[in-house]
Amino acid sequence: MNKVVKKIAAVVLSGLLVASVFAGCSGGSAKDTYTVGICQSMQHPALDKATEGFKKALTDKLGDKVTFKEQNAAGDSTLCSTIVNQYVSQNVDLIMANATDALVAARTATNTIPIVGTSVTSYGVALGLKDETATKTGINVTGTADLAPLDKQAAMVKEWVPNAKKVGILYCSAEKNSKYQATVVGAKLK
């Protein structure tokens, strides 16, 4: 199964999880409608598919009981903050944060509105949690992660170039998750 299909499947499962959260939080009296604010960090085919899959899963589960407010930050992290702050002031029922900048902005904006993230490599790294490898955040954030199997990547490098004295790892130093992956793989190559 390719990476995009896996990501879409994870988003659909995440959407179903969110639908069950809505149902479980009703306390016996379901709301008539739910409003979900979606903040996508930028336009990109993989991110677009993740958002589409999320919306489809919720719509399939909740029908016309769910409405979406969707905005794209066009790669501007400051705009992510503006978008999620609007959602917080509008008191949406849930925020879907698509990519790391959107997730960080959402968590900074609220600790009460549930946040579902996708297209995030490591929630622990992105949110500065003590346990960077945590699958449970212990806060109002959940979602799907796209962390590659770093140990297998390091093993593959060792297999392909067993006599290498040095290995260069390219990464974006401005992206916490990128630096985290480079550090982990680098340590496994030693």
State where each predicted segment sits.
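Extracytoplasmic "Venus flytrap"
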Residues: 33-55, 61-63, 69-80, 174-178
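An alpha-beta-alpha
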Residues: 36-40, 54, 142-189
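Beta-alpha junction/loop-to-helix N-cap segments that form part of ligand/metal-binding clefts
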Residues: 72-131
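Stable alpha-helical elements in mature extracytoplasmic
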Residues: 43-54, 79-83, 91, 98-102, ...
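Short, low-complexity disordered leader/linker segments with a strong preference
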Residues: 1-35, 59-63
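Loop/turn elements at helix/coil->beta-strand transitions in domains of secreted/extracellular proteins
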Residues: 64, 90-94, 111-115, 139-140, ...
